[in-house]
């Protein structure tokens, strides 16, 4: 079970990195006037409160709210925000300081 979870996290990490590079490549191909569109701040789009940061490295990672955190990780509760309301943040026990 632990091996399967580690492999899943590895695959998702690779997919995330590939998705980020594809997004950058697509942005380079877009005309300049489409690149300059100003989007609302992430906090406003997702209803984040100003005191909370995003759930990302080095703080933790987002998982579906009913799924358990990986071994060694703990739920952050309301400490960090995920982009989807159906997700929760799993953090390192030391709050991201390893």
From Swiss-Prot:
Record's family? Belongs to the Cnidaria small cysteine-rich protein (SCRiP) family. delta subfamily.
UniProt KW keywords: Cleavage on pair of basic residues, Disulfide bond, Nematocyst, Neurotoxin, Secreted, Signal, Toxin
Question: Does Signal appear among the keywords?
Answer: yes
Q: Describe the processing and modification events after translation.
A: Contains 4 disulfide bonds.
According to the UniProt entry, the coiled-coil residues are none
Cleaved signal peptide residues: 1-19
Task: Write down the superkingdom of origin.
Answer: Eukaryota
Q: Which GO terms describe its cellular component?
A: extracellular region; nematocyst
**What gene is this protein translated from?**
Ate-SCRiP
Q: Main role?
A: Induces neurotoxic symptoms on zebrafish. Has also been claimed to be implied in calcification, but this function seems improbable.
Cystine pairs annotated here are none
Q: Which residues form the propeptide?
A: 20-45
Name of the molecule in the record:
Small cysteine-rich protein 2-like
Q: What is its main location?
A: secreted
The entry's localization annotation reads: Secreted; Nematocyst
């Amino acid at each position: 079970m632990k091996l399967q979870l580690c492999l899943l996290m590895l695959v998702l990490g690779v997919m995330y990195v590939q998705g980020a590079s594809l997004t950058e490549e697509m942005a380079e191909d877009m005309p300049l006037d489409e690149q300059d569109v100003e989007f609302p701040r992430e906090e406003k789009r997702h209803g984040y409160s100003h005191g909370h940061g995003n759930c990302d490295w080095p703080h933790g990672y987002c998982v579906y709210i009913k799924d358990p955190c990986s071994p060694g990780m703990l739920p952050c509760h309301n400490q960090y925000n995920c982009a989807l309301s159906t997700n929760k943040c799993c953090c390192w026990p030391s709050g991201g300081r390893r």
